[in-house]
């Protein structure tokens, strides 16, 4: 019997890609706040060329998560996780929290100059 599909994988992938996309900019600020030296933080600049790829992965993963979570309830068979109203509401809440965090992470490089 196959496991019912949920939007968890896409949500996790989108969040991870957003973190990687902002690692070159958000990472140094967090590490400096934690007390790490600036010489080591310069190594995170290696991720900058891959930022567009990470942004694309984050947006695609969010799209698939949105599609999976907001599909018609009729597509769910009775007894599956997606047919339970409380679970659907929880997934929607988690989706919007992750989407907000992704947008913050993607927008952070543009507001970063205000922190330095």
UniProtKB/Swiss-Prot annotation:
Q: What happens when the gene is disrupted?
A: Merp-merT deletion mutant is unable to transport mercury into the cytoplasm and shows almost complete loss of the resistance phenotype.
Entry annotated with the keyword Protease: no
Tell me what happens on changing residue 27 to R.
Abolishes mercury resistance
Report one GO cellular component.
plasma membrane
Q: What are the transmembrane regions?
A: 16-36, 44-64, 94-114
What Gene3D superfamilies has UniProt attached to this entry? bacterial mercury transporter, merf
Write down the superkingdom of origin. Answer: Bacteria
Q: Check the record and name the Pfam families matching this protein.
A: MerT
InterPro entries the UniProt entry points to: Transprt_MerT (IPR003457)
Write out the annotated subcellular location.
Cell inner membrane
Locate the residues binding Hg(2+). Answer: 24-25, 76, 82
Q: Which UniProt keywords apply?
A: Cell inner membrane, Cell membrane, Membrane, Mercuric resistance, Mercury, Metal-binding, Plasmid, Transmembrane, Transmembrane helix, Transport, Transposable element
Mutating residue 18 to D: what's the consequence?
Abolishes mercury resistance
Mutation effect (residue 25 to Y): Abolishes mercury resistance
Single GO molecular function: mercury ion transmembrane transporter activity
Which membrane topology term applies here? Multi-pass membrane protein
Q: How does it assemble?
A: Interacts with MerA.
Protein family (similarity comment): Belongs to the MerT family.
Name assigned to this protein: Mercuric transport protein MerT
Organism from which the protein derives: Pseudomonas aeruginosa
